[in-house]
Amino acid sequence: MALTKIFLILLLSLLGLYSETVKSQNCDCAPNLCCSQFGYCGTTADYCGSTCQSGPCRVGGPPTGAGLVGNIVTQIFFNNIINQAGNGCAGKSFYTRDSFINATNTFPSFANTVTRREIATMFAHFTYETGHFCYIEEINGASRVMCDQNNRQYPCAPAKSYHGRGPLLLSWNFNYGACGQSLGLDLLRQPELVSSNPVVAFRTALWFWMKSVRPVLNQGFGATIRAISGFDCDGRNLGGVNARIGYYRDYCGQLGLDPGANITC
């Protein structure tokens, strides 16, 4: 009789464990958590590693597009872009994949949740703004001081220019000021840091991206054009808009994605 009771207890325990395992495999993790092979949510390698089912999976996860940024922006992907810049381009010896990866490491909320579509979108804009990473700052930018003297929160420093610099051409004193404040850099007094340090350059682009572009990603590529360069939309610069779309389609193809809907503005 005692053996029968022990057997029943063990059987019920196993059934309970099985039930809990099945329940856990119905993974409904938060967007920032990975679903492990056993259906549990977490952020460590046990959850986001090679057996990850869904979420921001890392190496070897399912082909959902989510994963560490370095696994999406490979050296080949980066080289395919920058190699199209001419040999005389200043950016060709300035921008590197490593500097981009290092910059993303300072934005963990980006690096740990980025998708292939977001990379295709981002690098389409990088390509357009910099001419395949040819330009570090906007053409003839030094002739455009771009100082809003009415902005008292971020006053312009004497003899400094706030023309477009970096992969997304950070411009105007109020953007340099807010960006520098966020990054812990005095970009109001040293705006040239953006064009002399490639990691800083990419960090400024990521700052603008997280603030103004990522919030509209789910609206389609067209919404990101409007967020970055709204004055090009509504037929005002069809050539520029179509060029951005062309790069986006190209990178979607390289990353195995359909461009999706709402790609123009």
UniProtKB/Swiss-Prot annotation:
Domain named Chitin-binding type-1: residues: 25-59
Biological process according to GO: cell wall macromolecule catabolic process; chitin catabolic process; defense response; polysaccharide catabolic process; response to fungus
PROSITE patterns with a match to the protein in the record: CHIT_BIND_I_1, CHIT_BIND_I_2, CHITINASE_19_1, CHITINASE_19_2
Residues the record marks as active site: E129
One GO molecular-function entry: endochitinase activity
Induction trigger: Accumulates during Botrytis cinerea infection.
This protein's UniProt keywords: Carbohydrate metabolism, Chitin degradation, Chitin-binding, Disulfide bond, Glycoprotein, Glycosidase, Hydrolase, Plant defense, Polysaccharide degradation, Signal
Annotated TM spans: none
EC number: 3.2.1.14
Disulfide linkage: C27-C35, C29-C41, C34-C48, C52-C57
Annotated glycan sites: N102, N262
Pfam family, one: Chitin_bind_1
Protein name: Endochitinase At2g43580
